[in-house]
Regions:
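Alpha-helical repeat scaffolds
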Residues: 77-90, 118-127
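Conserved structural position within tetratricopeptide repeats
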Residues: 40, 46-47, 87-94, 127-128
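Amphipathic alpha-helical repeat scaffolds of TPR domains
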Residues: 2-25, 51-72, 99-112, 137-142
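Short, charge-rich amphipathic interface segments used for partner binding and complex assembly
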Residues: 33-44, 108-112, 125
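Residue-level detector of alpha-helical secondary structure
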Residues: 10, 14-17, 21, 32, ...
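Helix-turn-helix repeat elements of alpha-solenoid scaffolds
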Residues: 27-40, 75-86
Length: 142
């Protein structure tokens, strides 16, 4: 359980994401396989250091990609995967509770999972945090 292993898995996952993004427009199945492999690396990075928000959030994003793929196939498992992605976003948010972007991502996942009350709550949290960020930026410029 070393920092080197964490970085190795994180970087390997990032490289696979880049490949998946390139493949997505021409070969969806290849992109999906690359996202799944990236997700495995993000999972291992997250397990190496569960205090790092980046690996936790990237794992959520990998699960979102899989949820989208399942949704595109009209699979009943899509809702479960969206719910799993939402839970992983919440875990990432717990590691960085000031990140409105993560809260908004959790809101989106809950929405696609059909969990509308949770989606609304997470959206409000995200809007609040992102509004604070905008106000702080305005105040620092003025």
């Amino acid at each position: 359980m070393t920092e080197a292993n964490y970085e190795h898995h994180l970087q390997a996952g990032e490289a696979l994401v880049a490949q998946a993004q390139q493949a997505a427009t021409t070969d969806f199945q290849r992109a999906r396989a690359l996202w799944q492999e990236a997700g495995k690396h993000f999972f291992h990075a997250h397990k190496q250091d569960e205090t790092q928000v980046q690996a936790a959030f990237r794992l959520a994003q990998a699960w979102m990609a899989e949820a989208y793929a399942l949704q595109k196939e009209a699979s009943a498992n899509a809702l479960v995967m969206w719910s799993n992605a939402a839970a992983q976003c919440e875990l990432a948010f717990d590691l960085n509770p000031e990140d409105g972007r993560i809260a908004m991502t959790a809101a989106s996942c809950h929405h696609f999972a059909g969990e509308h009350d949770a989606a609304k709550a997470w959206k409000q949290i995200g809007e609040h945090l992102l509004g604070q960020d905008a106000n702080e930026a305005d105040n620092s410029q003025g």
